[in-house]
From Swiss-Prot:
This is Ferredoxin-1, chloroplastic. InterPro entries: 2Fe-2S_ferredoxin-like_sf (IPR036010), 2Fe-2S_ferredoxin-type (IPR001041), 2Fe2S_fd_BS (IPR006058), Beta-grasp_dom_sf (IPR012675), Fd_pln (IPR010241). Gene3D superfamilies: 3.10.20.30. One of its GO terms (cellular component) is chloroplast stroma. The gene is SEND33. The keyword Transit peptide applies. It holds the Pfam family Fer2. Belongs to the 2Fe2S plant-type ferredoxin family. It is found in: Plastid, Chloroplast. It comes from Solanum lycopersicum (Tomato).
């Protein structure tokens, strides 16, 4: 009900447009515009995406990497070749060194605390936690 100068007017006769009650109907739009993922049950999850800059011997490369994708996997998806062997964080083939930003590499078990504190990272088990710059091809420096 609405009131105009003390008179009550009913708005029930006005047509109503149907409202979207869930993002399930527009799941692709949600992901494209807002970085939202929608499962079959309509549950929405938010994912962040960060700028990753890799300094390789061939020159720097940059790409966007979601916070739930390993840096090595996203680099390969973008068409970049990086060294790797085990893809499980159990060797040093994919070693790099973080020069700016930070990563989550809690899935790996090869690096000790001192190596992680020195900035070493295994790109096969590293998720970006924000924009990050990594020097790649650091296996020799790590094992020296």
């Amino acid at each position: 009900m609405a009131s105009i100068s003390g008179t009550m007017i009913s708005t029930s006769f006005l047509p109503r447009k149907p409202a979207v009650t869930s993002l399930k109907a527009i799941s692709n739009v949600g992901e494209a515009l807002f970085g939202l993922k929608s499962g079959r049950n309509g549950r929405i999850t938010c994912m962040a995406s960060y700028k990753v800059k890799l300094i390789t011997p061939e020159g720097p490369i940059e790409f966007e990497c979601p916070d739930d994708v390993y840096i090595l996997d996203q680099a390969e998806e973008e068409g970049h070749d990086l060294p790797y062997s085990c893809r499980a964080g159990s060797c040093s083939s994919c070693a790099g060194k973080v020069t700016a930003g930070s990563v989550d590499q809690s899935d790996g078990n090869f690096l000790d605390e001192d190596q992680e504190a020195a900035g070493f990272v295994l790109t096969c088990v590293a998720y970006p936690k924000g924009d990050v710059t990594i020097e790649t091809h650091k296996e020799e420096e790590l094992t020296a």
